[in-house]
């Protein structure tokens, strides 16, 4: 960087410290987080390493998913996630917010929470976010899912829920996300991809870990529900039979 700026490394370090960073490494980390927050679909495609044809692209895609999962495994504070999961059975109501592509994650989490008998609702549009967060209280949990800069409806939903005293949990991919600043807790999962779309391999893995932890807090109840589901899976009319 010093060479590109036409100065010496010591001057760069002084400038970085003047900006409030302890050192150059922290400044580099901030720039990396900034690049994640403001990345676009075109950026991810253009930054991807050139691959050997379509088959090479497929291999690279799987490799990136593996890296995202490995990063989640290496950085996730499992005790903090377990403590967070305990709150779900204590909550009066759980609102899971996620718009656009993140709507599939919100509905995925809602489905499993309802399966466990919890009072959960997915808010996947601007209107539902407004109406569901308008009535939350300190007895409720709001899970907000959005990546990069964060979608406006989701961010404003957290602002509304926080004002009303709800416990807010953010799932995003960078600490520079406004969700991270607004929420009581933040869990990170990378969505890096070599294609035009985001990869949700790591976010789904994070949700699976959270769902599993919630179930473990009341294991006898979870086991009873699992047995009921198993019976329906064996004999239920909604399953196709030859």
Language model regions located:
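HTH-adjacent hinge/linker in prokaryotic transcriptional regulators
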Residues: 3-80
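Generic structural signal for well-ordered, non-membrane alpha-helical segments
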Residues: 5, 24, 54-58, 62-65, ...
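Short, charged beta->alpha transition segments
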Residues: 56, 79-84, 128-132
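Glycine-rich beta-alpha loop segments
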Residues: 74-92
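Glycine-rich phosphate-binding loops that contact phosphosugars or nucleotide phosphates
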Residues: 89-217
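A short, charged, Gly/Pro-tolerant segment at domain boundaries
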Residues: 220-242
């Amino acid at each position: 960087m010093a060479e590109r700026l036409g100065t010496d490394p010591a001057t760069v370090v002084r400038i970085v410290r003047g900006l409030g960073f302890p050192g150059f490494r922290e400044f580099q980390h901030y720039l990396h987080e900034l690049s994640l927050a403001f990345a676009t679909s075109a950026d991810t495609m253009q930054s991807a390493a050139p691959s050997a044809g379509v088959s090479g692209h497929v291999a690279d895609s799987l490799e990136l998913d593996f890296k995202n999962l490995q990063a989640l495994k290496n950085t996730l504070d499992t005790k903090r996630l377990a403590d967070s999961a305990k709150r779900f059975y204590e909550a009066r109501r759980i609102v899971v917010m996620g718009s656009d592509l993140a709507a599939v994650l919100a509905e995925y989490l809602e489905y499993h929470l309802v399966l466990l008998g919890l009072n959960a609702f997915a808010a996947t549009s601007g209107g539902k976010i407004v109406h569901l967060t308008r009535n939350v209280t300190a007895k409720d949990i709001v899970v907000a899912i959005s990546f990069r800069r964060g979608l406006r409806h989701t961010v404003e939903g957290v602002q509304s829920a926080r004002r009303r005293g709800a416990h807010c949990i953010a799932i995003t991919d960078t600490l520079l996300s406004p969700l991270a600043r607004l929420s009581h807790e933040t869990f990170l999962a990378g969505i890096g991809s070599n294609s035009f779309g985001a990869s949700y391999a790591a976010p789904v893995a994070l949700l699976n870990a959270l769902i599993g932890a919630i179930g473990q807090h009341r294991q006898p109840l979870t086991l009873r529900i699992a047995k009921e589901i198993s019976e329906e899976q064996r004999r239920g009319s909604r399953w196709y039979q030859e």
